[in-house]
Design a protein with these regions (language model features):
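Short, compositionally biased
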Residues: 1-7, 56-59, 153-163
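C-terminal cap/linker of serine protease catalytic domains
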Residues: 5, 18, 36, 40-113, ...
Length: 197
């Protein structure tokens, strides 16, 4: 295990205490992460460039520059901790989704660059697309609260209520500040799930 830390993805995805391993393993998707006692502790989810980033941050000021210059030293796999999956396992097997209220989802890809949040894409037909959010927009605030990291943005959006709530985005576009109201949805309404036989 190279590090344990929060992981945020551009696709409205976040895990609080993800497990990062090195060296990278090519067959990572769905792989079991077994501890020294032979117990399952994680399920393989992603290949990442910055598995050692938290350790690098302690050693030098510019971790991103180091990672760019030393990709082989930092590439690895991200595992979802098994304790996050156990409570929803039966629902996932039976229905393909956890039961209960779903988080609000906007259907946009967002990149965090130097304390700014850039919209890098929107999913056709998703709430962000219907609200006419555009690639290149900069997300400044959510419901009047300034956001500068993906983590802050996701936590704020998810704290507002269940899928279906309306969310006000303050955006910077073409040198103008604009406000756009987005009616959120559940991401599962836009995903094809496994059919139960």
């Amino acid at each position: 295990v190279a590090s344990r830390r929060e992981f945020t993805g551009s696709w409205e995805y976040m895990i609080d205490n993800a497990i990062f391993t090195v060296p990278i393993h090519p067959n990572w998707s769905g792989a079991a992460l077994i501890n020294n006692e032979g117990k399952l502790c994680g399920i393989g989810s992603l290949w990442v460039n910055d598995a050692k980033k938290s350790d690098i941050n302690q050693l030098q000021d510019n971790a991103d520059e180091f990672l760019k210059d030393n990709p082989k030293n930092s590439s690895g796999n991200m595992f979802v901790p098994i304790d996050l999956l156990e409570p929803i396992y039966d629902d996932l097997v039976s229905f393909g989704v956890a039961s209960g209220e779903q988080r609000p989802w906007l259907g946009m890809y967002t990149s965090e660059i130097k304390n700014q949040l850039f919209v890098s894409g929107v999913i056709p037909g998703a709430p962000a697309d219907l609200a006419e959010i555009e690639p290149g927009d900069i997300v400044v605030a959510i419901n009047g609260h300034k956001v500068t990291t993906l983590s802050d943005m996701y936590k704020l959006i998810w704290s507002l209520g269940a899928a279906g709530i309306k969310i006000m985005l303050n955006l910077y576009r073409d040198s103008d500040d604009i406000d756009i109201m987005v009616k959120s949805d559940s991401r599962y309404n836009f995903m094809e799930r496994r059919k139960k036989h």
